[in-house]
Amino acid sequence: MKKYVSLVLCLLLAALLFTGCAGGNGGSSGGGKTSDAAVNEALLGCFGKSADEAVKALGLKDDQKAGDYGYTLDYAWGGQTMDTNCATNSGGAGVFGYAEAQKTFENSDAGTAEIKAFVEKFTAQFNDPYAVTRYTQAEKTKETYDAAQLETYLKDVAGGESGSGVQFRFSLVGKNDRMSDDGDYIEVSVQNTGDGLRVKLSMEHVNR
């Protein structure tokens, strides 16, 4: 019963967000959307708005702009639960969005191929069409994303000791102006658990 009520609330929330936020913002082009993509589009529809517009679209009061207010919606994506948040932030400076997905893969070449697809699918739903660049915390450099380089990282972790890992970021660049400023990124964290490769993906967007 509790799960049923939660599902109904999530559906109502998605409908509210789609009506209040998505209108007036063009969605990504392409074929038919999955229900997950439709929910995500409703949330991302708030990102192109100013803080004042977002507060109105989210049904918030003017005095709520000073804090973090908004909605968090859990829904299934690719067999995983993703937590997506749309809210005003930093004293009403803009709209903040965050999404996360996590999954464990086999510690093998087949596993690394599946991880590449997992990363690219996650990235594509936020920026379509999209291009990504890779940031590494150690090098402090920015370079064009190369799927072969990602595979090299994954194989290094797979061949390492249990507990070893790697973490890096993709900045989002593309025609979708809601997701094209420098503050947008997807972070990839891969850890060798000994039993497999645990991959955690997160997306963050701030529209100021």
Per-segment meaning from a language model:
Residues A37-L44, E106-D109:
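Short, recurring structural edge motifs at helix starts
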Residues A22-N25:
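Bacterial signal peptide processing site
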Residues N40, A51-L58, T112-V119, T123:
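Extracytoplasmic/secreted envelope proteins and their assembly/folding machinery
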